[in-house]
């Protein structure tokens, strides 16, 4: 993980660690002119590692985004941001996206009153995301909400931290996307 964030920069969904400043100066191979191929590859790798996708999953999302109306890049980022694991991370119910994936895989999360155990589940507007009524599930979410620094919540999401409930209001705006992509 640390090699990846050192190479690609800060990936907030991947880990809470940040790369040290000045690390580029120590490695002379990283400096110099960057080719177009290298820039595109690094941006693709940022997407993959930030959202925890395989190469095949990312290609499938790109195909869906190409078929949709609008800018392919914007539609792709909207698709990735509306995944259940990412929404849990944005709500603060998990400290990282891999942590959110684990919550979903272990069946702690309900969407509209039904257990969903697929992290790539695509949330829609007016979806209600809650935890199971079990004490263990609530404790996991409570620890995550308490330990996470309170960042500004995107306007397409609402959270009720006392009931451990989140609501998807609308599809995300491009200005709320947390990853800087070139």
UniProtKB/Swiss-Prot annotation:
InterPro entries from the UniProt entry: Ribosomal_uS4, Ribosomal_uS4_bac-type, Ribosomal_uS4_CS, Ribosomal_uS4_N, S4_RNA-bd, S4_RNA-bd_sf
GO BP of this protein: ribosomal small subunit biogenesis; translation
SUPFAM superfamilies: Alpha-L RNA-binding motif
Region described as Disordered: spans on this chain: 12-31
Residue ranges constituting the S4 RNA-binding domain according to the UniProt record: 82-143
Keyword field: Chloroplast, Plastid, Ribonucleoprotein, Ribosomal protein, RNA-binding, rRNA-binding
Cleaved signal peptide residues: none
Major location (coarse): plastid
One example GO MF annotation: structural constituent of ribosome
Tagged with keyword Cytoplasm: no
SMART domains on file: Ribosomal_S4, S4
An annotated GO cellular component: small ribosomal subunit
Quaternary state and interactors: Part of the 30S ribosomal subunit. Contacts protein S5. The interaction surface between S4 and S5 is involved in control of translational fidelity.
Similarity field: Belongs to the universal ribosomal protein uS4 family.
Function: One of the primary rRNA binding proteins, it binds directly to 16S rRNA where it nucleates assembly of the body of the 30S subunit.
Protein name stated in the entry: Small ribosomal subunit protein uS4c
Gene that this sequence comes from: rps4
């Amino acid at each position: 993980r640390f090699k990846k964030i050192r190479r690609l920069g800060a990936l907030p969904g991947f880990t809470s660690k940040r790369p040290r400043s000045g690390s580029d100066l120590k490695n002379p191979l990283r400096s110099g002119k960057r080719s177009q191929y290298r820039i595109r590859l690094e941006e693709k790798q940022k997407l993959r590692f930030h959202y925890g996708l395989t190469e095949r999953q990312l290609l499938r999302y790109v195909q869906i985004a190409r078929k949709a109306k609008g800018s392919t890049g914007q539609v792709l980022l909207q698709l990735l941001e509306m995944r259940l694991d990412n929404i849990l991370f944005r709500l603060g119910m998990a400290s990282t996206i891999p942590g959110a994936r684990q919550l979903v895989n272990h069946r702690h999360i309900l969407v509209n009153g039904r257990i969903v155990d697929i992290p790539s589940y695509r949330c829609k507007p007016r979806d209600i995301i809650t935890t199971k009524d079990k004490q263990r599930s609530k404790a996991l979410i409570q620890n995550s909400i308490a330990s996470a620094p309170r960042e500004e919540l995107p306007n397409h999401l609402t959270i009720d931290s006392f009931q451990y409930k989140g609501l998807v209001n609308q599809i995300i705006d491009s200005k709320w996307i947390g990853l800087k992509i070139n």
